[in-house]
């Protein structure tokens, strides 16, 4: 199981805590050369749906770019995609009062293992 990484509000840059997790992903992918993953990025519910789709795609791309920059073959990440605010992990949808920590849980990239050899 690979831990999700998290993003600051309205940002898509890789934070230092996320870089540590991504380095673990790279280590794992180097250990298992047949491992293929998909990246799924998300936002919290603040901002317009369309804007959040664009933002989540930028998050997916920055995550992909980081992993590729560490020498992983792009063929091993055949798909990276943003889902905007369509897959919230909690009750924090439009108009619901939530704490900063609750919103943070939704600003994430998840890693789905497609193949493991």
Language-model-detected regions and their locations in the chain:
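Periplasmic peptidoglycan-binding/anchoring modules of Gram-negative envelope and division proteins
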Residues: 6-41, 64-69, 111-117
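Periplasmic OmpA-like peptidoglycan-binding domain that tethers envelope proteins to the cell wall
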Residues: 40-117
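Pro/Ala/Gly-rich low-complexity, hydrophilic intrinsically disordered segments
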Residues: 1-3
């Amino acid at each position: 199981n690979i831990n999700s990484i998290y993003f600051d509000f309205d940002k898509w840059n890789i934070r230092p805590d996320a870089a540590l997790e991504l380095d673990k992903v790279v280590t794992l992918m180097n250990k298992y050369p047949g491992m293929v993953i998909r990246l799924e990025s998300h936002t919290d519910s603040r901002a317009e749906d369309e804007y959040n789709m664009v933002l989540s795609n930028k998050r997916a791309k920055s995550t992909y770019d980081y992993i590729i920059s560490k020498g992983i073959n792009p063929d091993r990440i055949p798909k990276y995609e943003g889902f905007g605010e369509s897959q919230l992990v909690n009750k924090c949808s439009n108009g619901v009062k939530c704490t900063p920590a609750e919103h943070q849980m939704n600003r994430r990239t998840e890693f789905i293992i497609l193949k493991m050899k």
